[in-house]
């Protein structure tokens, strides 16, 4: 992508306003907390302290809006306390330029590095550094600075208390995550009726798993509907795929296929009903026809083999989902102990060493988080020096704008810079007009500031433009409440905001952290995770007891994590003005399609894992070992820009005995797995041999010239492959059930069909009413 197109796309993204579900009650609660803090501060301490405490309450309320599964009161208290500490330390060093610059560089570096611990911590830390640049100018003594810091902590405590006293959908985010996962599976079941090999985006399941990780206090108060349904939902997906896939299920046509279509439609209706009940905390209302579809005895008479087992398994899992979604007490379907232990979330105190460890692991050359920390600290120092040198008097606007817009990736940094400047112009213009018309006093300015803050809380998820406009107006009214005339803040803020945005954009262009060169590494990590997942699944057939084998569930989760990392990297790379450097967009799309096919085949084999007392399959052990070794070598080849080869897997399949083995699942799945691996090699083999045509030497299309002929091309006059010397067709010596050359591979998309993942949704699926879109 060229720079012009990249700037055009990021500008459009920054100036766009999305339609999102608004939360007026949550916005009203945040504005009420801000009003309480300002009123108390004005009554007892005066306008300057009120402005400082307002910044603390304002930032604490923003922290409660972050997409985090942690309790909201903890976020509010942490935000207010960290801003108070930053303000006090900043004021102590504010009188000495060198000391303050050193503190600013250190604070911004740590804030940039905190993105390694997660986006929530990164956003809170960056916002606190930006707010500190303003709040250190308000106190007039060390004692006053301590008082201002204490009032900022008080603002965070007030917001936390309001969250506890007036909860709005206390478990709403967790309910939405689990309901979105069930709704995504309902949509998947309906799509399988039209496309038996339809892809499935595992992001909703991973989001639900993240939401299921709770602190000990959360685990004690979790609603009964949120216990156990996620684990059941993860087991439903492979059963749906195995029931619909003709490779291991039923034929494409006939009464068996008709029965499978009915079962898939009923499964979609049942999953939608469960998702609706969990989302709203209401009883389950299931269509009677959907339940009757699974209870009819015709299913056992029509289906047989793996399809019959999959149908029975699906009916049992759906029954468990309905019972869990309709549970009103904690005694129904509790999650296993081992799963609860794996999904425990550390408390806020225990999170500190974990976050420090994550930040320490990013201290290596080439880390995108480290490069972001270096960028943001350098820009903050340079911006502060430029703002101080300019004859405006409020030099903190430039570094504040830069720190607020800078993010670890290119598209967000540039789009936020555009939105910041555009929103500042709009907000400042509106605030200036109101000031000139109303000439507000201290209390009216405070009222207008609270109103702007409430509007910002309401529209902050619709886009950066609207949020930045509200923030700009809020700051104008808040500083006006503190005694500064609007004419002293408006012009300089517009100019210095532009300076800060330009510095942020220039810093990323000079010292970037492009994702495009790391695409091969992400692809290799995904391939390696899929190889380990496939080896764990196939190894279960060799040792059904699974005494010393790796856990299939852990391998599956690792593969999903690697897939999400690839999707995020590919999405960022599409917006970067960088050449592909060996992995074009077409090759990346083809490789992604091949890896999705690999994961799907492995999921089908997982759906039919043998019981612990089943007969072992020795050939599966050799195949599992060959697959693990081949994918490790293949991942190394992908990183080194070579084409991976799969001779070890091919040899293991050639030595497969096959007697006493469920051929429709294991052996056929292994063959499909090898085909998908070869598709991956074809996608990465982008070297095309040059073709030279000499106009003075006539030749026919079927007879390449000697200097253009590949080593495996037949000589002129030689019989074509598949025929004898006399031209007669050779008998077909392929194994029964093997696909014909050139035939459509099982699991491959039909000609003209879109590739899986070509248009990935930007977030989790919507409500279950629109799941069949």
Provide a role label for each language-model segment.
Residues 1-31, 35, 43, 64-67, ...:
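Long, hydrophobic alpha-helical segments that serve as membrane-spanning/inserting helices
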Residues 465-473, 485, 684-686, 690:
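C-terminal functional regions that serve as terminal interaction/effector modules
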Residues 227-228, 585-590:
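All-alpha amphipathic helical-bundle segments outside canonical DNA-binding/catalytic cores
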Residues 1-161, 305, 310, 315-469, ...:
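Alpha-helical transmembrane segments and their membrane-interface boundaries
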Residues 592-595, 599:
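Long, intrinsically disordered, low-complexity regulatory segments adjacent to structured domains
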Residues 108-113, 153-192, 500-512, 522-537:
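Hydrophobic core segments of alpha-helical transmembrane domains
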Residues 382, 474, 500, 566, ...:
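Hydrophobic, well-ordered secondary-structure elements that form the walls
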